UniProtKB/Swiss-Prot annotation:
This protein's record includes keyword Aminoacyl-tRNA synthetase: no
GO molecular function, one term: calcium ion binding
Keyword Metal-binding: yes
Protein name in UniProt: Actin cytoskeleton-regulatory complex protein PAN1
Domain EH: start-end pairs: 270-359, 593-681
Region of interest: 2 X 23 AA repeats of F-A-L-[AG]-M-H-L-[IV]-[NY]-[DG]-[VK]-L-[QN]-G-[DK]-[TP]-I-P-[YN]-[EV]-L-[DP]-S: 328-672
Composition bias type Acidic residues, residue spans: 888-899, 1253-1265
Lineage: Eukaryota, Fungi, Dikarya, Ascomycota, Saccharomycotina
Subunit structure: Component of the PAN1 actin cytoskeleton-regulatory complex.
PTM-bearing positions, type Phosphothreonine: 241, 563, 985, 987, 1301
Species whose genome carries this gene: Saccharomyces cerevisiae (strain YJM789) (Baker's yeast)
Start and end residues of each EF-hand domain: 269-304, 306-338, 625-660
């Protein structure tokens, strides 16, 4: 058999002369050689050849049998497991000059590699097989084979005289020198380390220095580094996951000194992560990360290379191509910002720059300090493996630990290290019984194994190789077998065994071919020049390592899982590269270009937002491109074909121009990357709009409504105009039926309104949702507005549908108050403005300014000031010329400033008042809105909406007027819908004595029914009072009601009921009065006019009112609670009482006026007879009308009643009527002989003037609602009544009478003052104060009766005269301020018939608006004491001629005080 080792022998023998023999193994071999005193010389090769028996190398060497003599036949090579390389050395001695063929014959195959035992650490053993000398075979037979390894047999024998060889470590750690005997001159073999890292070749020192050699340290080979003190391997631990940990698992470089400085632009957590990542990629001995390593991390972010290049440019502040930690942290921070949507800054801010630079300076300073303090060279990543000798080599486990054929996984074993005594003995010579013994050629089986490595006590240490020369083993690198693939997928490099030996491959998967050693010349073989042929050995390679006994074979160590950003499958290298290539290939407009183009665009356009065609053309032509290119660029830019470009389109055009200039072709169609974002948004919006109608149409109309729960809604009509009109017509029919007199009731109609609210609201909403067409003409718009108003009016008003549980009178009161509020607030505001203007005018009057204001309301404008200054300057110049002193400009300006400041202060007060009024209005509207929502049961209305639609605030005039009309119409429709026609009520008669009044109802049931219906009627008429001319209407209605009440004085006095005035009876009565003036004057009916005088006693009306109250209470017990009943009935009682008094006074006054008109046309012959019947009527006429109309319409009736009562002391026949032109101011002399004073009338008049018994209607009561319907018509009728009397006015002032009995009350000063507060003074105040000084007929007889009454006496007498004077009549003065006596006095007063004409004139004036009771008069006017007079009254009294008026005879009452 060819032995490949034959070529090794010569190479080794040439170099073994100068080197000491070195055992290769973990522990020294126990070799049996010659005695130590054997001289060195020729026999040495023989002895060494004796050792060149087949030796088991590795752990658990195979048992070998050697014969006593070496045969020339080579034995089968026996190698350990995984013989990847020849870890042994063939010893040869070049000094003996042995034949090469001898060595070739006797050198046996050497076992290389190791077969680790499961209980021992790994070791690499090499056997030594010097070629034997045939001449020394007898001696060689006695030498026992030596096993190197762990489990060698302990049975060793000394052959012949050869002493037992000393155990020599065939590994790293040589046994201690004391094992060698003292007489040994041979130096021990130097241990050789096997593994990756070879030490420098060293010559073996001289023998005297052999004791100082340090043993080789075990070295670890492979991936999993084991500590020196090997502990049993543990299972693999899970590795940390994450982007940072994926790098950190490979190890952190903790040698980097990073100062503890905090970077403000990143968080502490981010800085810690970046530091960990930085340490994981920085190589040992460096403080910076290279560009290649940094690129691996930065590319994982997914950003395009262009952006990463910009980030690198910003971060590499030192321009060194490498990054320190602050620069690396800054790069990671910028990448995070870009991933979150931010842009890369063009340059770093100063703060960040300063932080990074200071951090770099701190790092440089720390490095300098470290270099100065370090004594040795800077550390490198390979310092721990590079040593001067072999002493620093670390133990190496070579390869993976295979699963042996014994079925027990082998533990990794450290070769070398520790004390020899601690190692387990190894059997040599025999091999443990294995299953593959048959595959080995064991040689002679008779040899006993020897214990090596343990140095047992039974054996003496044997010195081996005493005569041997120092030999070098394996100077030339040898590879036994093929170069196998290791378990890591990488070919392991050669390993030096020993000081100068190249490392040899051990372990691995590659099957080692059997090797044959034979004579061959290997002169200076270099690495990879293999001279040995690989030979297959008996053992098959198996994986080693800590793995369970399974078929699993790990090819590479586990790597950390990729987590974090950039580690998904979409960021794989293939996708990454493709995306980067695509993105880089796309043509885009960079942000730098956009900013540059936008700045340039600002120069082209200043105000407009678009670039016109001339600007662009001129700008693009400057590029020098031809016309075709420019046209193509323009067509690409002007996407919408508008002839102008916006910012983005302009930037696109500039980009294309520059691209063409740089050699890029102009695209025929814009790529998606160049389309402006605005255009993309518009296109997207267009697509959405195109697709939306289809989606809405696809939606089913009925949805998913269940058939069981579906209910058709009849009100849900289709939205076309025809159906809307049908809906409105249906609503109109409902309303017409509701407003007709045949409607069932108000409650039923209100419930109908409530049910129709929803449908009405729907139709109104549909109407408002109708689109407005601005293209219509004004006429069409007006027609549409008119039609819309009509439709709104035709819709039933749902706002009046109150809750049925709320009493109707409360709702009516609420509506009435709400109706009064707007006018009330307007009046308050107007009055406040007038007060403000009056204050300003007053201030200007008190402090006249030299500047005449020409502005509105006399305000001073700037032009006025300039004129005043110019005039002042002119005056100053003139004064300088003339020497006169004038006012300076300073005084003028100060005066102007004072005036303007005062006016401003007054206006500020007005503004504050307006704010207060506004606050009050808002609070009232808030309360009203909540009340209305409670009463109607609807949702809460906001305060602003309530003010807007109820008070009309914020609406235009036309809308406000329409709302007013709408409210008034709705109120009228409500009142007309349910008129009450009592079955037991007699129909009203047209004559004066048959107007519908409470006295017509004889029974209590009829009266109660009448009152109940009247109350309901008033509740329904609440809202009707609110209109534009409300006060005028109410005043005229009061006057008409007074005429109405005058027709039936007797019935009113007897029953004291409420009279419901009707328009038609009033008109008929007035026409009767005018047409037939002589009928009531006939002598056959003198007593009829006196009858209404008797019931004028003021005490009687309370009794019928109480009866009415009781009847009303009985009728309402079923409907209302006790508390509400009590309150309502109390209010109704008071109202009825007031109205009864009113009706009495008005009826008497009207009767007197009519009688006065009739008496003016009588003949003188009917004087006394007619006066007997009409005595009281003319007396009341002058008193009541002027007082009533000047003070209050409700004041007149009492004065009428008082005047109707005749004074005591008059004769029964009365005074004869005057024959002098029927002048009411003068009477006969015979009439002056009797007293015409009526104490009761005087007291009544006095109370009227004081406002004690008047029914003050301040706009918040409900008394005059019944008078509103006929207000306007009655106003005209009253005017008609007054006109004929006014025509007869001239005779009144023309013919004075010699004596007038009723003149004493001619002092009208107090009443004139009260009447003129809101109206112009009455110019016909007839009698001056001097008239009272003339003594009329003595009034002594009636005085005792007058004094007996309890009413206020004389001090209030002038007020009575005031009333008389205002009336313009010469009626006798009612000087007595007391109530009339209970028995009626005689009614014949001849002189009282005459003053009526004057009163009629005054009455006409009042009706015309010139009297005291004008349209602007207020019910709340305070009565001024009668003793106080005014200049206006005196002025009003002057026009009356007093010549010929006889003085009134002195009465028992002192004359009124003179005027002031």
């Amino acid at each position: 058999m060819y032995n490949p080792y034959q070529q090794q022998g010569m190479g080794y023998q040439q170099q073994q002369q100068q080197q000491q023999q070195q055992p290769n193994g973990f522990y020294p071999q126990q070799q049996q050689g010659q005695s130590s005193n054997q001289p060195q010389g020729q026999p040495q090769p023989q002895q060494q050849m004796a050792f060149n028996q087949p030796q088991a190398t590795g752990i658990g060497g195979m048992p070998q049998s050697f014969g006593n003599s070496f045969s020339t036949m080579p034995q089968q090579p026996q190698t350990g497991y995984n013989n990847n390389g020849n870890n042994g050395s063939v010893y040869g001695n070049g000094n003996f000059g042995q034949q090469p063929q001898q060595q070739q014959q006797q050198v046996k195959p050497q076992h290389t590699g190791y077969v680790p035992n499961s209980s021992m650490p790994m070791m690499n053993t090499t056997g030594t097989m010097p070629p034997p000398n045939p001449a020394q075979q007898p001696q060689l037979q006695s030498i026992q084979p030596q096993g190197t390894g762990y489990y060698q047999s302990a049975n060793t024998a000394n052959v012949h005289s050869v002493q037992p060889l000393q155990s020599q470590g065939t590994g790293y750690y040589v046994s201690t020198p004391n094992l060698i005997s003292s007489n040994q001159t041979q130096q021990p073999l130097q241990a050789q380390g096997t593994g990756y890292y070879q030490s420098q070749p060293q010559q073996v020192p001289p023998p005297q220095q052999a004791q100082s050699l340090q043993p080789l340290k075990p070295q670890q080979t492979g991936f999993y580094l084991q500590p020196q003190n090997q502990a049993p391997l543990e299972p693999l631990k899970p590795t940390a996951t994450g982007f940072v940990n994926s790098f950190a698992n490979n190890g952190l470089n903790n040698d980097i000194k990073i100062p503890a400085i905090r970077l403000s632009f990143i968080t502490a957590q981010d800085q810690a992560k970046f530091e960990t990542l930085f340490r994981s990629i920085v190589t040992n001995g460096s403080n910076t990360v290279s560009g290649a390593n940094c690129r691996k991390i930065l590319m994982r972010s997914g950003l395009p290379p262009s952006q990463l290049a910009r980030i690198w440019t910003l971060c590499d502040t030192s321009k060194a191509g490498e990054l320190l930690f602050p620069e690396f942290a800054l790069a990671m921070h910028l990448i995070n910002d870009v991933l979150q949507g931010d842009t890369i800054p063009y340059e770093l801010d100063s703060k960040t720059k300063n932080e990074v630079s200071s951090f770099i300076d701190a790092i440089n300073l720390s490095i300098a300090n470290q270099d100065s303090s370090a004594n040795d060279a800077p550390k490198t990543p390979f310092d721990e493996f590079i040593t001067a000798g072999v002493q620093n080599l670390q133990p190496q486990p070579t390869g993976y630990m295979p699963q042996t054929s014994f079925g027990i996984p082998l533990q990794s074993q450290i070769t070398g290290g520790g004390v020899a005594s601690a190692l387990n003995p190894q059997s040599t010579g025999f091999m443990a019984p294995t299953t593959f013994n048959m595959s080995m050629n064991t040689g002679t089986p008779g040899l006993n194994p020897q214990i090596t490595g343990g140095a047992p006590a039974s054996m003496q240490p044997n010195i081996t190789g005493n005569a041997l020369q120092p030999q070098t083993t394996g100077m030339m690198p040898q590879t036994t077998g093929m170069m196998p693939q290791t378990s890591f997928g990488v070919n392991l490099g050669p390993q030096l065994t020993g000081g100068a030996l190249q490392s040899q491959y051990t372990g691995g998967y590659g099957s080692v071919m059997p090797q044959q050693s034979g004579p061959a010349s290997m002169p200076n073989l270099s690495f990879n020049q293999q001279g040995l042929q690989s030979q297959l050995t008996g053992l098959q390679p198996q994986p080693t390592g800590f793995l369970p006994p399974s078929n699993f074979s790990a090819t590479m160590p586990l790597t950390a899982q990729k987590t974090g950003f950039g580690n998904n499958e979409i960021y794989t290298k293939s996708n990454f590269g493709n995306n980067l290539i695509d993105n880089s290939s796309q043509d885009k407009i960079s942000t730098e270009e956009k900013s540059l183009f936008y700045k340039f665009l600002k120069l082209l356009i200043l105000k407009t937002k678009v670039v016109r065609f001339p600007h662009c053309c001129g700008n693009f032509r400057k590029s020098g491109l031809n016309r075709a290119d420019l046209e193509q660029i323009w067509n690409l830019c002007d996407i919408n074909n508008t002839g102008q470009l916006n910012k983005q389109e302009f930037a696109l055009g500039m980009h294309l121009v520059y691209g063409k200039l740089n050699g890029k072709p102009i695209p025929n169609v814009l790529p998606s990357s160049l389309i402006p974002s605005s255009t993309k948004l518009l296109d997207n919006l267009k697509n959405q709009l195109k697709t939306e109608p289809t989606t809405t149409k696809e939606k089913p109309s009925f949805g998913k409504i269940d058939a069981l729960s579906y209910k058709n809604n009849d009100d849900d009509v289709l939205p076309n105009y025809r159906n809307r009109r049908k809906v409105y017509s249906a609503k109109n029919e409902e309303q017409s039926s509701f407003s007709s007199p045949s409607a069932k009731s108000v409650n039923h109609s209100s419930s109908t309104l409530q049910t129709d609210d929803i449908s009405v609201d729907k139709t109104v909403e549909k109407k408002t949702a109708k689109p407005k067409y601005s293209g219509f003409s004004r006429e069409i718009n007006l027609k549409n507005i008119a039609s819309l108003e009509n439709e709104i009016k035709n819709i039933s008003n749902p706002e009046n549908c109150y809750d049925n549980s709320i009493p109707s009178d409360l709702t009516s009161r609420f509506d009435a108050i709400i109706a009064k509020l707007p006018n009330l607030f307007n009046e308050i505001s107007t009055i406040d403005n007038e007060i403000t203007n009056a204050k300003i005018q007053l201030y200007r009057k008190k402090n006249p300014s030299s500047i005449i204001g020409s502005g509105p309301n006399g305000e001073i404008t700037e032009n006025d000031r300039k004129k005043a200054k110019s005039r002042a300057l002119l005056r100053a110049r003139m004064s300088a010329l003339t020497g006169k002193s004038t006012e300076s400009e300073d005084s003028l300006s100060m005066e102007d400033e004072q005036q303007s400041a005062e006016i401003k202060r007054i206006q500020q007060e007005n503004g504050k008042n307006q704010e207060i009024i506004k606050d009050i209005r808002s609070s009232i509207s808030d309360i009203s809105a909540s009340l209305k929502s409670t009463m109607t049961g609807s949702n809460m209305i906001s305060n602003q909406e309530f003010e807007r639609w109820e008070f009309g605030i914020g609406l235009e005039d036309g809308v406000r007027e329409f709302l007013d009309d709408l409210k008034s119409n709705s109120n009228k429709s409500v009142t007309e819908s349910s008129p009450f026609v009592p079955s037991s009520t007699p129909t009203p008669v047209d004559d004066r004595s048959s107007s519908p009044s409470y006295s017509q109802f004889k029974t209590a049931e009829e009266r109660a029914a009448y009152l109940k219906e009247q109350a309901k009627k008033r509740m329904k008429e609440k809202l009707a009072k609110f209109d534009k001319n409300r006060r005028n209407v109410t005043q005229s209605s009061r006057s008409i009601s007074s005429e109405n009440s005058r027709e039936q004085p007797q019935q009113i006095a007897g029953s004291s009921n409420l009279v419901e005035p009707r328009a038609t009876p009033f008109q008929e009565e007035k026409y009767v009065e005018v047409a037939q003036p002589t009928q009531p004057v006939q002598s056959t009916q003198p007593v009829q006019p006196t009858q209404p005088v008797q019931p004028t006693q003021p005490v009687q009306p309370t009794q019928p009112v109480q009866n009415v109250y009781n009847a009303k209470q009985e009728s309402d017990d079923e409907d209302e609670d006790d508390e509400e009943k009590r309150l309502q009935e109390e209010l109704k009682r008071l109202k009825l009482k007031k109205k009864a008094d009113k009706e009495k006074r008005l009826a008497a006054l009207r009767k007197q006026i009519e009688d006065a008109q009739n008496e003016s046309d009588e003949e003188e012959t009917n004087g006394k007879d007619n006066f007997g019947g009409h005595v009281n009527v003319p007396q009341a006429a002058p008193v009541a009308p002027s007082a009533a109309f000047s003070q209050n319409s409700t004041n007149a009736p009492r004065s009428v009643h008082a005047a109707v009562t005749p004074a005591a002391g008059k004769n029964s026949t009365g005074l004869p009527s005057t024959t002098m032109g029927h002048n009411p101011y003068f009477k006969d002399a015979s009439a002056s002989s009797t007293s015409t004073f009526d104490a009761r009338a005087a007291e009544m008049q006095r109370r009227i003037q004081r406002g004690l018994d008047e029914d003050e209607d301040d706009g918040w009561s409900d008394e005059d609602e019944s008078n509103n319907r006929v207000a306007v018509d009655n106003k005209v009728e009253e005017a008609k009544i007054g006109h004929p009397d006014h025509a007869r006015a001239p005779p009144v002032t023309a013919a004075p009478l010699p004596s007038v009995t009723p003149v004493p009350p001619a002092v009208p000063v107090p009443q004139a003052n009260t009447s003129n507060e809101k109206s112009s003074p009455i110019p016909i105040a007839p009698i001056p104060p001097s008239v009272t000084q003339e003594p009329p007929v003595p009034l002594a007889p009636p005085l005792p009766a007058v004094d007996g009454f309890q009413e206020p006496p004389i001090p209030s007498a002038p007020a009575i005269a005031t009333a008389v004077q205002k009336s313009g009549s010469s009626t006798p003065a009612l000087a007595g301020g007391v109530l009339p006596p209970p028995p009626p006095l005689p009614t014949q007063q001849a002189s009282t018939s005459e003053p009526i004409i004057a009163h009629v004139d005054n009455y006409n004036g009042a009706e015309k608006g010139t009297g005291a009771y004008g349209s602007d008069s207020d019910d709340d006017v305070l009565s001024i004491p009668e003793s106080v007079g005014t200049d206006e009254e005196e002025e009003g009294a002057q026009p009356v001629s007093t010549a010929g008026i006889p003085s009134i005879p002195p009465a028992g009452i002192p004359p009124p005080p003179p005027l002031p």
